[in-house]
Amino acid sequence: MKKDISIAPVPGRKWTIGIRYGSRIEQLRILPVKAVRITNEKHDSVMLSNPDCAPWCRTRLKMLVTSECTAGYALQPGSLVLKDAGGRMFEPGKDYEINEEYGTFMRTADGRIREGEPVFASYSFFHSRLDSIVLAEDGVIVQRLGDEDMATPAPPPVQPGEKLLANIYFSGHPDRISGDMIFPVLTNRLPVSPSQTELMPETVAKLKSGKKVRILVWGDSVTECSYLPEKEHYQTMFLKRLRSAYPKADIEMRTLGWGGRSTTTFLNEPPGSPYNFMEQVVAWEPDLVVSEFVNDGGYSPEMCEECYGTILDAFRGNGIEWLILTPHYIKLSWMGLTSQKNCSEDPRYLVRFLRKFGKENRIAVADGSLKYGHLWENGIPFMSYMVNTINHPDRRGMKLFADALIEAMTEN
């Protein structure tokens, strides 16, 4: 890991960073993301206040819309103004409720916004952006601007002769640069999952011999992945690489994903349900089940033991091998994190449990979490991979899963 670079905010200067690179010490003024002002954006109607409605599912400011949700913290606080067609201003807290984190709002039951009445919204917001600090070919350290995006900004390409030193992540509405926005590039590698072919002997033997192999990929919305093209699903990438690694392989792969659900949900589904565990997972008679459940992340130790123990008993009793994919990193507050840096150790009990459970029971574990936890060392904030700014990875995040799976399934 590189130790010859240090970048930090300069005290007393809102948008200036101090750079130590080798024997060089200098300062660089950073160009921040500018607010965008929207005037009189028409909304044909406003949802009635409902405390059970998720904050990102309410009436959405249109410029903040991402995949399925709205961009968290993109709205400039205090900037929203709602008016009727005649220009009369509505009062927040009285006529409507606003969630400034997600840029959504609802009309109150006793307010002046009527059912079906159009309203006109004016507000300011910020795009996300991932810039690069590079050592240019002429020896000058410069800021390269990335493309602005509401959810998944990508860093600019590094030109021939340039050296990438760090990335700067603009997200939300910062009023000055902070250390948490600066991602020095400490390495260009991610941890590799060890080969675990010995824990899936029957499946691997069939892959090598050309006998028919049935693989069931089982999970939640990340596995269902209705928000991305099929070619960008992790299991599609995994299948392509599996066939390349085992040229004789005859693979039948099926996906069973259910958005917003967990292992417990599947286990509790009644007979006849298209998501009943015994009928739709076990009875399909797969040789191998690949499981991914980020939605199990809030499970207690007792729930982990009960659910995963039940699944293991069913698989072992029916000759099914298992490859557990540890979950990706998600919205910081949902993980108990305060920064996307120095987060190599996943704080979720579920991940620690799955690693231990795999070792104790000789179950293969592909460690997707481990790769996400080290993105910061590569200069990448993991939230820049989330298309909904919460928990749905883009194609780059899906590739990390495919990497972890193929590493576990091959002799690396």
Over which residues does each language-model region extend?
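Non-catalytic propeptide/linker segments at domain boundaries
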Residues: 156, 168-210
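Catalytic His-Asp segment of secreted/periplasmic serine-dependent ester chemistry enzymes
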Residues: 192-199, 329-412
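Acidic/histidine-rich helix-loop elements
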Residues: 255-272, 299, 342-343, 390
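Short, well-structured alpha-helical segments in soluble
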Residues: 268-285, 305-310
